[in-house]
Amino acid sequence: MELDYNKVALKDLSLVWPEASKLIDKSLKHSQGQMNLDDILDMLSKDYLSLFIGYSKEGIDIAFTTQVIIYPTYKALRIIHLGTTDGLDYEAMEVIVDMIADSYDCKRIELYGRKGWEKALVDFNYYYAGTILMKDLKEI
């Protein structure tokens, strides 16, 4: 399935957010309480994060937030939150993400996610690059 995609402009955020937030909300179940939907909307409205959507005639099929990370030697597109409709073709998603990364002249895509993403994206040249360890010092 081929999807059209757009970066959501700040002026259009209120129009798209009700539908896109349902997909973004799926990713929050695995985010260790770092943010909620209100936090994400606030960060989007302040342009700290960017929201991209992929859509078909049925509606929004993928929604994800990103940041461009600038390292001394390269830029990376970091995917912060990503939610899809059930059964989305990962190849369609991959085409969108690659084009967005290329438009920012990024040399790498970073995606922190649950273990299932590693298996789902291995065919698209994603690889395991480390482990995130956490220690709660106070109740979150």
What role is predicted for each listed range?
Residues 111-115, 119-140:
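Active-site/acyl-donor-binding loops of N-acyltransferases
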Residues 31-49:
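Active-site rim helix/loop that mediates acceptor-substrate recognition in acyltransferases
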Residues 74-122:
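Acyl-donor binding region in acyl/amide transferases
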Residues 1-35:
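Short amphipathic alpha-helix that is part of the acyltransferase structural core
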Residues 41-42, 67-69, 99:
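Short, flexible, glycine/charge-rich loop motifs used to bind or transfer phosphoryl groups or to couple energy/partner
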Residues 46-87:
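Conserved donor-binding loop and adjoining core beta-sheet/short helix segment
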Residues 60, 103-105, 127-129:
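Short glycine/proline-enriched coil/turn segments at helix->beta-strand junctions
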